[in-house]
């Protein structure tokens, strides 16, 4: 009697390989999506770096009593009639706005609005504020007086803690409620 040696993959081996690939994909895809969201949020925060620099320089060099209106820091907040920023700092950011400054040294908070309407990041806003001390929460942050140094910037999500996992670690500790 002659024995027949089978060559190649059997159907069972192929099915096992498909199951293994499916399990790996089920684990890897959510982790990849979280990494993509973190990268998107980080890019938006980096995109407003020049705005942070401009606000810092203005605070450190403006004479006492200077009044700066809402969106008056020169960060590209000019909006058209539809309240859409004319200057888009990145492909993920629809607009950037800033709060007014007053003689008491309040204001200069940057708000970043995301452009993604079909994403879980839709309607996410991030706030960043200059502080006169090394703090990590908005409640403890006060804008430095004009002529003083900006010691730190605090940042966090606005009115939400739901999506804080996508914020950089330096922004997760605080939530700006307004």
Residue map of PLM features:
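N-terminal single-pass transmembrane signal-anchor helix
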Residues: 1-51
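Periplasmic/extracellular, small/polar-rich flexible segments of pilin-like filament-forming proteins
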Residues: 60-178
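Membrane-proximal N-terminal amphipathic helix
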Residues: 34-66, 72-80
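Generic hydrophobic/packing signal
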Residues: 13-22, 54-57, 114, 120, ...
């Amino acid at each position: 009697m002659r024995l027949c040696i089978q060559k190649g993959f059997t159907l069972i081996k192929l099915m096992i390989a498909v199951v293994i690939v499916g399990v790996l994909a089920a684990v890897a895809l959510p982790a990849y999506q979280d990494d993509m969201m973190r990268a998107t949020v980080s890019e938006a925060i980096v995109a407003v770096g020049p705005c942070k620099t401009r606000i810092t320089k203005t605070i450190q060099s403006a004479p006492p009593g200077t009044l700066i209106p809402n969106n008056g820091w020169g960060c590209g907040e000019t909006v058209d009639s539809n309240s859409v920023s004319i200057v888009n700092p990145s492909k993920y950011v629809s607009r950037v706005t800033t709060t007014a400054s007053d003689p008491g040294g309040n204001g200069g908070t940057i708000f970043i609005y995301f452009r993604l309407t079909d994403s879980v990041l839709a309607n996410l806003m991030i706030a960043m504020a200059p502080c006169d001390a090394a703090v990590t929460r908005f409640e403890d942050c006060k804008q430095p007086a004009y002529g003083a140094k900006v010691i730190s910037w605090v940042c966090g999500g606005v009115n939400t803690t739901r999506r804080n996992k996508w914020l950089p670690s330096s922004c997760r500790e605080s939530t700006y409620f307004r």
